[in-house]
């Protein structure tokens, strides 16, 4: 079942903006800014689950760049068939992250158990936001005419 064209357009806009904002934030963190936290230690505790430190700047920048590429891939309609595959992969990945939660995700990534601050923020903000973004990405999947429909 395909979403209504307006729903698909809203999903593309929402997911494009959300992923672009997350990408820009990661690029900002890669420069050394702790915003919106007061310090890099507080930021590390809130977003990485460990006051011991943040991932290296190049890795954070790579995540930011990847989010910006995902934003472009989910928000545009240049090659619908390819972009629907991209949307399916990105949307499913985001929903899987939301379903697993930050605690399980950090374990799967081989990281130490996350702090109580991270677990609380994950439950209240990160998981719901990631779930909404995942649903928006999937809502952006648009109908692509089949060969039969083109012949008719």
Predicted regions and their residues:
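Short amphipathic, positively biased membrane-proximal segments
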Residues: 1-152
């Amino acid at each position: 079942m395909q979403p209504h064209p307006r729903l698909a357009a809203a999903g593309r806009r929402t997911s494009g903006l959300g992923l672009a904002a997350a990408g820009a934030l990661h690029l900002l963190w890669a420069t050394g800014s702790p915003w919106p936290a007061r310090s890099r230690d507080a930021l590390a505790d809130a977003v990485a689950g460990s006051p011991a430190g943040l991932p290296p700047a190049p890795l954070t920048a790579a995540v930011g760049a990847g989010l910006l590429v995902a934003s472009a891939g989910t928000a545009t309609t240049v090659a619908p068939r390819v972009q629907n595959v991209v949307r399916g992969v990105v949307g499913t990945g985001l929903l899987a992250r939301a379903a697993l939660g930050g605690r399980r995700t950090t374990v799967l990534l081989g990281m130490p158990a996350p702090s109580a601050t991270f677990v609380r923020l994950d439950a209240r903000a990160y998981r719901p936001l990631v779930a909404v973004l995942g649903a928006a990405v999937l809502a952006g999947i648009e109908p692509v005419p089949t060969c039969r429909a083109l012949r008719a």
